[in-house]
From Swiss-Prot:
Extracellular compartment segments: 49-617
Region (Required for interaction with CTNND1 and localization at cell-cell junctions) location: 641-713
Placement of Desmoglein repeat repeats on the sequence: 903-929, 930-960
Entry membrane topology: Single-pass type I membrane protein
Native organism: Canis lupus familiaris (Dog)
Name of the protein in its database record: Desmoglein-3
Maturation propeptide residues: 24-48
Origin organism lineage: Eukaryota, Metazoa, Chordata, Craniata, Vertebrata
Glycosylation sites noted in the Swiss-Prot or TrEMBL record: 109, 179, 458, 544
GO terms for biological process, alphabetical: actin filament organization; cell-cell adhesion; homophilic cell adhesion via plasma membrane adhesion molecules; negative regulation of cell migration; negative regulation of p38MAPK cascade; positive regulation of bicellular tight junction assembly; positive regulation of protein localization to adherens junction; regulation of protein stability
Molecular functions per Gene Ontology: calcium ion binding; protein dimerization activity
SMART domains to which the protein is assigned, alphabetical: CA (SM00112)
Cytoplasmic side: 639-993
Highest taxon listed in the record's lineage: Eukaryota
């Protein structure tokens, strides 16, 4: 049964092949009248090949009368239902809806007018589909061609074509090519364009020829002349269908280019002018020419030249580019005595070469020019304008001073003789080497020439000489050239074979070395003349061509010797200066090594070499260690606190340097907190013995009288001096002195609270001894300052009342018109707004200070009454103070927590108030004042200060400040107990600081 299955399958396969072979898709086309089939024979089998074209259609026409333009047919149509479908341009691609197909019959129809310029042809894809929509045939590509019609005119690429041609060009020379296009079908009669010239401007003889089909514009003749017609305008037409169809016009602008075909000609046949002799001018004459070529071109621009007569090069001709004129210049002065008139000829040509068409016709035509020279009175001049001098060979460059070169005189051009009344000076004189005699014009050297002088160029020195006419002031300039020989040129250098020799040797070899090999020996060595005073006489013997042996006639002792040698070559040339050689002679050891003169172990070999040394490893290590320390130092600086650590201790930061200001203003170091009020210990006053002697404790007080004055000196160097009833003294703990003379008594003492000492009084008749200690302030400055201030205050007190201090008024309100503060009443309207009740009193801290300043301390009045004959101080430390007064004395003692004392005496001479001097130094202040009513010499009181454990305050010169701790005594000397003396402070009008 198996073979039956294979037989059935084979029969079915053969049947399918037969169906496929006999089935086909055919295209039928009808003629114009639909009667016969064209393009493809009907019902012919093409073996599955499709026809690729259909009936053509004409553009811009209604082609519907030709429908159907094609018909497609499939062979499967006989056995099954076939549906036809088309696609492509004109169907489902732009332009849409041009073609349609009958899906049952396969007829293709055109439904719209087409444009060939937009779509030259259409490609239509044809499909044959079964009922399932599947292709039963391979798709067929159908081409529909569109026939062209002449519907487009030619188009030129430019509306105006520009061209140019040189004048005198040969005929048939190409000028330009015109270009036009047609949108109709290429290579068709509809797109074939023909050109022709419609018109020419300027009208006349046709000058150009236009090719009909190529559009080339050529010259018709060779007679184009730019000077006659510089440009042409052509109107050109282009028509399709070889000139029978549509046409278009354009313009052609043709410029005729200029060529140098015209010769320039002088406007005048001859020219003449005149000029004064010895003068120059930039425009003596202008020449005009005529040239017909195009202006401001090289064909028009003239070039002037001399044909004869300007052999002396007196004249030049320059062309003016704006006018094309020739400008005659005089560049070299004319001499009337030599030339009374100058005649020359000129010619002209163009800058550009002449055109080949006329170059054979050009001939040089000369135009004569005559220049008359006018005679004028001439001055001086150098003839010749330059002169050369030569320095003779063999002279040294170091011996040129006063070397005479020669003379160079100016001449009078009217007489051609040496000019008179002329002064000569040097003009250009580089380096100031030369000098000319003002009268004789003799030139000589005034300086020697350095070996490397930059003023010598090519062995020549150039300078200028000026001759000044003393009558007219005119100047003539001449140039001189000084030729100098080659100084030191290739001069040999003499060297010693050894720089040092032993004292046992008496000879050394010298050699000559030449920088240039071509100057070789033999050389002759000779010694300069030697003085008889020299310790050693030398001689020299020639060894060979370049060496000699230098011998000493006597025994050499250690030291340096200088020998002068002269070297002469084979041509008798020698150096300008002798060569100076330095030879060292020294003591040598058994190894012939020269020992140095300093006695150390430094040796120098006789060959000039020193023992070599090297840097050891230890030295290298030290260098590296030093570098590391330098690098470590900045790092250590970064660890410093710069004073920001806590107060005290190791890291307490920087400690401020004491400046002495702590005694005046206490530095609390805080803001806002009130200072602590402390009591000040009273000043201790030593008692007085019954015998009148001073009781002292290690005070070292001694007295000496001189001229009624007193010197008060501290242990540290403080010194106060008073004399003739008026004194001012000041001193600092560091040590200084001040002295003042006649006038009111004022005193100032300054001392640091941190120092102590004993003040002693010395009285002498010869002078005052001043002991100064170490101090940070200039003693001379302080001495001068306080002395001047004391004199000024004293003189001021003598001539005016003391009204320039702080005055106290009973009433300072509005009712007191003389009150200096009466105007303060204007501020009474703010009394309600500001609480100024705190101004009614000074408070507990300043109350004592005010009592001390005003002298109203009640406690002092009650503690110690004042008697007529003596004044006793307070007794706080077991001491007392007594002062003998022969007359009535009114005094007060002020005691308080501040421990201050003040004494005053009544006198008609004293003023009520004292001017306020400015304090200049912080510290303790003390005033000692002495006055005598009888006029006799009265010695002042003595004040001795010794340190205590507490601070004390003395009010002086209106300044309250702490002074040094006091533990001494205050005592009036015995010599002053019979006089009127007082110890006082300034007026209560003092200011507080």
């Amino acid at each position: 049964m198996t073979w039956l299955l294979f037989r059935t399958s084979g029969a079915l396969a053969i049947l399918m092949v037969l169906i496929l072979v006999h089935g086909e898709l055919r295209i039928e086309t009808k003629g114009q009248h639909g009667e016969d089939e064209t393009a493809i024979q009907g019902r012919r089998r093409y073996k599955r090949e499709w026809v690729k074209f259909a009936k053509p259609c004409r553009e811009r026409e209604d082609n519907s009368r030709r429908n159907p333009i094609a018909k497609i047919t499939s062979d499967f149509q006989a056995t099954q239902k076939i549906t036809y479908r088309i696609s492509g341009m004109g169907i489902d691609q732009p332009p849409f809806g041009i073609f349609v197909v009958d899906k049952n019959t396969g007829e293709i129809n055109i439904t719209a007018i087409v444009d060939r310029e937009e779509t030259p042809s259409f490609q239509i894809t044809c499909h044959a589909l079964n009922v399932l929509g599947q292709d039963v045939e391979k798709p067929l590509i159908l081409t529909v061609k569109i026939l062209d019609v002449n519907d487009n005119a030619p188009v030129f690429s430019q509306s105006i074509f520009m061209g140019e041609i040189e004048e005198n060009s040969a005929s048939n020379s190409l000028v330009m090519i015109l270009n036009a296009t047609d949108a109709d079908e290429p290579n068709h009669l509809n797109s074939k364009i023909a050109f022709k010239i419609v018109s020419q401007e300027p009208a006349g003889t046709p000058m150009f020829l236009l090719s009909r089909h190529t559009g080339e514009v050529r010259t018709l003749t060779n007679s184009l002349d730019r000077e006659q017609v510089s440009s042409y305008r052509l109107v050109v037409s282009g028509a399709d269908k070889d000139g029978e169809g549509l046409s278009t016009q354009c313009e052609c602008s043709i410029k005729v280019k200029d060529v140098n075909d015209n010769f320039p000609m002088f406007k005048e046949s001859q020219y003449s002018a005149h000029i004064k002799e010895n003068t120059l001018t930039s425009e003596l004459l202008r020449f005009q020419v005529i040239d017909w070529d195009e202006e401001f071109t090289d064909n028009w621009l003239a070039v002037y030249f001399f044909t004869s007569g300007n052999e002396g090069n007196w004249f030049e001709i320059q062309t003016d580019p704006r006018t094309n004129e020739g400008i005659l210049k005089v560049v070299k002065a004319l001499d009337y005595e030599q030339l009374q008139s100058v005649q020359f000829s000129i010619a002209v040509k163009n800058k550009a070469e002449f055109h080949q068409s006329v170059i054979s016709q050009y001939q040089v035509k000369s135009t004569p020019v005559t220049i008359q020279v006018v005679n004028v009175k001439e001055g001086i001049a150098f003839h010749p304008a330059s002169k050369t001098f030569t320095v003779r060979k063999g002279i040294s460059s170091k011996k040129l001073v006063n070397y005479v070169l020669g003379t160079y005189q100016a001449i009078d051009e009217d007489t051609n003789k040496a000019a008179s009344y002329v002064k000569y000076v040097m003009g250009r004189n580089d380096g100031g080497l030369l000098f000319i005699d003002p009268k004789t014009a003799q030139i000589k050297f005034v300086r020697n020439i350095d070996r490397d002088s930059t003023f010598i160029v090519n062995k020549t020195i150039t300078a200028e000489v000026l001759a000044i006419d003393e009558n007219t002031g005119k100047t003539a300039t001449g140039t001189i050239y000084v030729e100098v020989p080659g100084f030191n040129e290739n001069c040999p250098t003499v060297v010693l074979e050894k720089k040092a020799i032993c004292s046992s040797l008496r000879s050394v070899v010298v050699s000559a070395r030449v920088p240039d090999n071509k100057y070789t020996g033999p050389y002759t060595f000779s010694l300069e003349e030697q003085s008889l005073k020299l310790p050693v006489v030398w001689s020299i013997t020639t060894l060979n061509a370049t060496s000699a042996l230098l011998n000493a006639q006597q025994q050499l002792s250690p030291g340096e010797y200088t020998i002068s040698l002269t070297v002469t070559d084979s041509q008798d040339r020698q150096c300008e200066t002798p060569e100076s050689l330095t030879l060292e002679v020294c003591q040598c050891d058994n190894r012939d090594i020269c020992r140095s003169s300093n006695g150390n172990k430094d040796y120098e070999r006789l060959d000039g070499k020193r023992p070599s040394g090297r840097l050891g490893s230890a030295a290298i290590g030290l260098l590296l260690l030093g570098l590391l320390l330098l690098l470590l130092a900045p790092l250590l600086l970064l660890t410093c606190d710069y004073g920001v650590g806590p107060i005290g201790g190791v890291t307490g930061g920087f400690i401020p340097v004491p400046d002495g200001s702590e005694g005046t203003i206490h530095q609390w170091g805080i803001e806002g907190a009130q200072p602590e009020d402390k009591e000040i210990t009273n000043i201790c006053v030593p008692p007085i013995t019954t015998s009148g002697a001073d009781f002292m404790e290690n005070s070292e007080v001694c007295t000496n009288t001189y001229a009624g004055g007193t010197v008060v000196e501290g242990a540290s160097g403080m010194e106060l001096t008073t004399k003739l009833g008026a004194a001012t003294g000041s001193g600092a703990a560091a040590g200084f002195g001040a002295t003042a003379g006649f006038g009111a008594a004022t005193g100032l003492g300054i001392g640091s609270a941190g120092q102590s000492g004993t003040m002693r009084t010395r009285h002498s008749t010869g002078g005052t001894n001043k002991d100064y200690g170490e101090g940070a302030i200039s003693m001379n400055f302080l001495d001068s300052y306080f002395s001047q201030k004391a004199f000024a205050c004293a003189e001021e007190d003598d001539v005016q009342e003391a009204n320039d201090c702080l005055l106290i008024y009973d009433n300072e309100g509005m009712g007191a018109p003389s009150s200096p503060v009466g105007s303060l009443g204007c501020c009474s309207f703010i009394a309600d707004e500001l609480d100024d009740s705190f101004l009614d009193s000074l408070g507990p801290k300043f109350k004592k200070l005010a009592e001390i300043s005003l002298g109203i301390d009640d406690e002092a009045k009650q503690s110690q009454p004042l008697s007529k004959a003596s004044l006793s101080g307070m007794e706080s430390c077991g001491y007392s103070l007594e002062v003998q007064q022969p007359e009535s004395v009114r005094g007060q003692t002020l005691l308080g927590s501040q421990g201050a004392s003040a004494l005053s005496a009544s006198s008609s001479v004293l003023q009520s108030a004292t001017s306020i001097p400015n304090p200049v130094q912080h510290g303790s202040y003390m005033v000692t004042e002495t006055y005598s009513a009888s006029g006799s010499l009265v010695q002042p009181t003595t004040t001795v200060l010794e340190p205590l454990l507490t601070q004390n305050v003395t009010v002086t010169e209106r300044v309250i400040c702490p002074i040094s701790n006091v533990s001494g005594n205050l005592q009036t000397p015995m010599e002053l107990r019979g006089s009127r003396n007082m110890i006082c402070t300034e007026d209560p009008c003092s200011r507080l600081i």
